From Swiss-Prot:
One of its GO terms (cellular component) is nucleus. This is Heat shock protein homolog pss1. Residues 703-720 have a biased composition (Acidic residues). Belongs to the heat shock protein 70 family. Required for normal growth at various temperatures. GO terms for molecular function: adenyl-nucleotide exchange factor activity; ATP binding; ATP hydrolysis activity; ATP-dependent protein folding chaperone. Induction: Increases a few-fold upon upshift to 42 degrees Celsius. Its main location: cytoplasm.
Length: 720
């Protein structure tokens, strides 16, 4: 398959990631190397290589200090961000540190202490996601759409883009996860109303670390996000934390151990709690057992679902305020909603469903796949954006979460001039372009910033970027030039100054508009009437210098080179392990066959020498050959195969001779059967009076009943 036909959607989750692909007129979810439909969002660093995804999950228990999760929560953040220090550090077992001005993780990699930035960590994980997709599609993957939380800021979105680019991916769009779920819902509906009376739907997404509510209006061929409200730090991991603290307090009293003071014990308890919570979703109570939690103690306990629900009551109280706010921003009442669509793994918790259903006063809808709806929406979006896919037309109208204001210094010629303007308001469509007009005679600066600092996550800076508009000069009369600046919120939700230029008012000629009657009366050879009008005409492009709080190009290039080197190292280690396993398998397999199927094809002396050779290779493999290079394992295997190859070939030749003999016997039997069947057929000879056809079989002879007279008739047959 050509790489250009591979369109992939990635739901980059906090605990796991789902990959979907558009193919064969459908959206399929891709399974990973262990046939799971989702891949743990983990990267782990070892003595010889990295472990990514499922491999990182397997290594986590013994290597948790060098394993990093909650990857997307680190994107674009600084080390001193209070949400990093006070919240994320509780969910990440690796040591967090500052790397190139942003938060990263310090781990032991290749037996050395190494620090990786959040961009490097995410890029490492994306290389695994890319490899999973390519293995399934049997071709390269580049164009993707990646989901992000709607509350991600400009710098967080840029960090994710940079990580994806380092991993060799080309994101066509960073898509807000609520919009992706809405696309999955809407594009399959054939009964959507006209735009005049849209269908209003609430999409409630309750995932591992984030809770969001969107009010969406669906109509034929499109949807509009009317509002999105998030609780950035509410998710299933908060429920896990409540259970961990509960059982840790119980074990402190019951076993006199302080689980929370021991990272390994805390990890073991967290693993057990995750299993327990799943049991509680389907049962009224659940046991908890943790073997060797610490100090050689096997800890056990028990909890009722009702006690669990009481334990997380403070979390449940946070479910309705975002719903109320979303309805308020959308300007509708809950009674106006057609349905409430539930997305995210945490929506399986019975008490969560109960609280939300009670607020709306109606049943909840689970028509969307809670785990896969966002990934499917991303794949659909990628197909829509791809020039090689034909998808039913469906327009996505997403909105920005944070308003953006531009500010500038007033000029001496106009000191009363406004010095700021909110260019993109809250709920402004994405993508969106605005043109700002200034009157200047010299270069000037523009500052883009979020309008409301209190809305931003953690210590994300309010300022987005500063733009220096260069090359501005007075107009030909020595007066102020008219400067136009085109600013855009692109498909990723990232702010871009696309163009700056000077315009002048010039007198130009344009055709005079005529009525249809005048057009009909006009003679063919009559010249077109023109009139002179004054219009703004672009006369010069201006260069724009940008100052952003982002990593320099040379640092990103260093990350790219480091990632390529680590990919090569991972590949070499994997191939070395493969050769070692192949050698081990050959030793055991061949030795068993020498006493079995290979026995008739070797003599005692040859067999004895070869067995001795295999035993020596086995001893070497578990001693000095325990840790060596790919080339050495390959050479050892080739040495053994040179001796064992002739024996194996004699066996294969004999098997082939048997096969041919059986085949010949079958063909002979088949031929004999066919010959016998031919003999049983009618002769097929033509006879006179039959019109060139074989004569029909003779009629059955009738036997007259007793005492019945039989009349014999003779027919003279007329020949042709």
């Amino acid at each position: 398959m050509s790489s250009r036909t591979n369109v992939v959607g990635i739901d980059f989750g906090n605990s796991k990631t789902v990959i979907a692909v558009a193919r064969n007129r459908a959206i399929d979810v891709i399974v990973n190397e262990v046939s799971n439909r989702s891949t743990p969002s983990l990267v782990s660093y070892g003595e010889r290589s990295r472990f990514l995804g499922e491999a990182a999950k397997s290594a986590e228990a013994s290597n948790f200090r060098n394993t990093v999760g909650s990857l997307k929560r680190l994107a674009g953040r600084t080390y001193d961000d209070p949400e990093i220090k006070d919240i994320e550090s509780n969910f990440i077992s690796a040591k967090l540190t500052e790397v190139d001005g942003f938060v990263g993780a310090k781990v032991q990699y290749l037996n050395e202490e190494t620090a990786f930035s959040n961009i490097q960590l995410i890029a490492a994980y994306f290389t695994k996601i890319k490899a999973i997709a390519e293995a399934e599609l049997i071709g390269s993957v580049s164009d993707v759409v990646i989901s992000i939380p709607a509350w991600f800021t400009d710098i967080q979105r840029r960090a994710l883009l940079e990580a994806a680019n380092i991993a060799g991916l080309n994101p066509l769009r960073l898509m807000n996860d609520n919009a992706a779920a809405a696309l999955t819902y809407g594009i399959t509906k054939t009964d959507l109303p006209e735009p005049e009376s849209p269908r209003r739907v609430a999409i409630v997404d309750f995932g591992h670390s984030n809770y969001s509510v969107s009010i969406v209006e669906f109509s034929r061929g499109q949807f509009h996000i009317k509002s999105t409200v998030c609780d950035r730090n509410l998710g299933s991991r908060n429920m896990d934390k409540a259970l961990i603290d509960y059982f840790a307090a119980e074990f402190k009293e019951k076993y006199k151990i302080d689980v929370l003071s021991n990272p390994k014990a805390t990890f073991r308890l967290a693993t057990a709690v995750e299993r327990l919570k799943k049991v509680l979703s389907a049962n009224a109570n659940a046991p908890l057992n943790v073997e060797m939690i610490m100090n050689d103690i096997d800890a056990s306990s028990f909890i009722k679902r009702s006690d669990f629900e009481e334990l997380i009551k403070p979390l449940l109280e946070r479910l309705t305020p975002p719903i109320e706010k979303a309805l308020e921003l959308a300007g509708i009442k809950k009674e106006d909603l057609y349905s409430i669509e539930m997305v995210g793994g945490c929506t399986r918790v019975p008490i969560v469903k109960e609280v939300i259903a009670n607020y709306f006063g109606k049943g909840l809808s689970f028509t969307l796949n809670q785990d896969e709806a966002v990934a499917r929406g991303c794949a659909l979006s990628c197909a829509i954006l791809s020039p090689v896919f034909r998808v039913r037309e469906f327009h996505v109208h997403d909105v920005t979460t944070y308003p953006i204001t531009f500010s500038w210094e007033p000029i001496p010629e106009n000191p009363e001039e406004d010095s700021s303007l909110e260019v993109f308001s809250e709920g402004n469509p994405i993508p969106s372009t605005k043109i700002l007009t200034f009157y200047r005679k010299a270069p000037f600066k523009l500052l883009a910033a979020y309008s409301k600092e209190a809305q931003l996550p953690g210590s994300i800076k309010q300022n987005i970027a500063q733009y220096l508009i260069n090359d501005v000069v007075p107009n030909k009369d020595g007066d102020l030039s008219i400067v136009k600046i085109k600013v855009r919120l692109d498909l990723h939700g990232i702010l871009v100054v696309e163009q700056a230029y000077i315009v002048e008012e010039q007198e130009v000629e344009e055709p005079v508009e005529t009525s249809p009657e005048e057009e009909a009366e006009k003679k063919t050879d009559e010249p077109v009437k023109m009139r002179k009008v004054k219009k703004l005409v672009k006369v010069a492009d201006l260069s724009v210098s940008v100052q952003e709080d982002r990593l320099p190009t040379e640092v990103l290039e260093k990350y790219r080179e480091a990632e390529h080197q680590m990919i090569a190292t991972d590949k070499l280690v994997a191939e070395t392990v493969d050769r070692k396993n192949a050698l081990e398998e050959y030793i055991y397999d061949t030795r068993a066959k020498l006493d079995d199927i290979y026995a008739p094809f070797t003599n005692e002396e040859e067999s004895s020498k070869f067995k001795e050779m295999l035993t020596k290779a086995e001893d070497w493999l578990y001693e000095e050959g325990e840790d060596t290079t790919k080339a050495v394992y390959t050479a050892k295997l080739e040495d053994l195969m040179r001796v064992g190859g002739p024996i194996r070939q004699r066996y294969l030749d004999a098997e082939e001779a048997k096969r041919q003999k059986v085949q010949a016997e079958r063909e002979a039997a088949k031929a004999a059967t066919k010959s016998e069947a031919e003999k049983q057929k009618p002769s097929g000879k033509f006879e006179e009076g039959t019109g060139g056809r074989a004569p029909p079989p003779p009629p059955a002879e009738e036997v007259a009943p007793e005492n019945e007279e039989v009349e014999t008739m003779e027919i003279d047959e007329q020949k042709e």
